[in-house]
Structure formats: structure tokens, C-alpha cells
Amino acid sequence: EYEKKLEAETFFTTHEMATITVLADIIIPKDEVSGSASEAGVPAFIEFIVKDMPQHQTPMRGGLKWLDLQCFERYEKAFKDCDSKQQLAMIDEIAYPEKAKPELKQGVAFFNLMRNLTATGFYTSEIGVKDVGYLGNRPNQWAGVPDEVLKQYGYSYTEKELKECI
């Protein structure tokens, strides 16, 4: 019931969701191995997480606003409306914390959160699990207890055990 309540609510605006989608696909683009973050449902995952974990709401909304303001100052348009070259130039300034200018620290903090949520959403999706090649728990082959250990304890397998169990 709690999950249904969260899914019924909307936190991000259409504009914010479009920006999140662009950012997620910059962070994890489609390649020859797997689909993009948006194809994996990352924007919907982020929408769900900020409703489930309200402490992310202000940093995410504030970060999206900060990003748009930076792009308006530089390019006279919102981040989502910039061309890919402009978007990447903006992201390059905040994606590497150790290289970022001090005045961009708010953007760095936002992008770190965005990157973490994107990676979490992607690698917990079906596309992401396939991307890393995770097959799940699989039984391995077991040849039984080694003969020297069995002898040490005065035990040996019966013909039935050998036939049915090993």
C-alpha cells in the first residue's frame, strides 16, 4: 500500500523529469552492450526514490534548478534545451569533484547525487543486471567429500550415495 501511495504521487515537474532523463543518459548512455539509463527506467526510479527518501528532494530539485540557471547564464536556455556539446561542457565542469572550481561545489554535490541514483537505478534494473552479466545464484558441481577426509573419519560413501548424490 505504501508503494502504491508513492507511485500515485508526482514530485518532479515534466521539465525536471526531462532534465533528469537527459542527465541519466549522459551518465549511462546506450552502447553496444546495453541500453541507456532512460531505457532501464532510471528517471522513474529517481522519481520513486525521492518520494520514498524525502531527504533527496531538496538536493535534487535545487540541483536541477542550479543546473538550469548555470545554462541560462552561459547559453540562454535550460539545460535540457542545450545541444549535446553544451550539455557535456556543463557536466564536465561538475562531474570531477577534484577538478571542479570552488564556486561550482553545489553543482558537484548535485551531480554526485544524480550519478549515484542513476547508477543504483540502472544496475538494479533488468538491463543493468544483464550489462554486468550477473546470472544470479547458481548451484556448482560438488564431487563430495575428498576420499582422504572420509578415511580420516572412518567413513566411506555407499554405492547408493555415490549413485544418487554425487
Regions found by a protein language model. Name each.
Residues 1-22:
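C-terminal segment of N-terminal export signals and the immediately downstream linker at the start
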Residues 4-5, 22, 41-166:
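Mature-region segments of soluble proteins
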Residues 22-23, 29-30:
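N-terminal secretory signal peptides
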Residues 28-29, 96:
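Residues at helix-coil transition
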Residues 34, 38-39:
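Zn2+-dependent metallopeptidase catalytic domains
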